[in-house]
Amino acid sequence: MSSYTHETLPTQLSSEVEGDIKATYRAIEVSRPGQFSEVSRPLLDPGPGHVRIRVEACGVCHSDSGTVEGVFPINWPRVPGHEVVGRIDALGSGVQRWAVGQRVGVGFLGGACGYCEFCRNGDLVNCRNQGYTGIYHDGGYA
């Protein structure tokens, strides 16, 4: 078992401007099982159909320890955290149902494909192609 404590993980986004106009954010990244580091990453614009969220809080869940300990098949590095609350701060093209400033929550399920048998029947929870937040794509320890 890895030696780490969840209490050492910051849960708020710190956005800063470096140089002229290059915005970054800080995150807690796991570069390999049990190896945490605080990193600065570029603040990217959201892609089509996506939103960018400024994290206000992120819970710590037992499944996050699985991410940290390498239990899941993960492409490293990874930012854990799937119990996220924040506000939308940017919209990708084509986004119509959301607004900048709107408070949102992000859970474990990181989306559904919309094409598999389950999705076609409205059963998004059992989508065969979904990615999990903090496991298959970066989470809220940012």
Regions found by a protein language model. Give the residues of each.
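Short, P/G- and charge-enriched loop/turn segments at secondary-structure junctions
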Residues: 13-16, 73-76, 130-134
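Extracellular beta-rich ligand/substrate-recognition surface
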Residues: 28-36
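Glycine-rich beta-strand-centered segment in the early N-terminal region that forms part
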Residues: 42-58, 68-117, 137
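Conserved Rossmann-like nucleotide-cofactor binding loop
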Residues: 61
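Phosphate-binding beta-alpha-beta segment of Rossmann-like dinucleotide-binding domains, i.e.
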Residues: 108-142
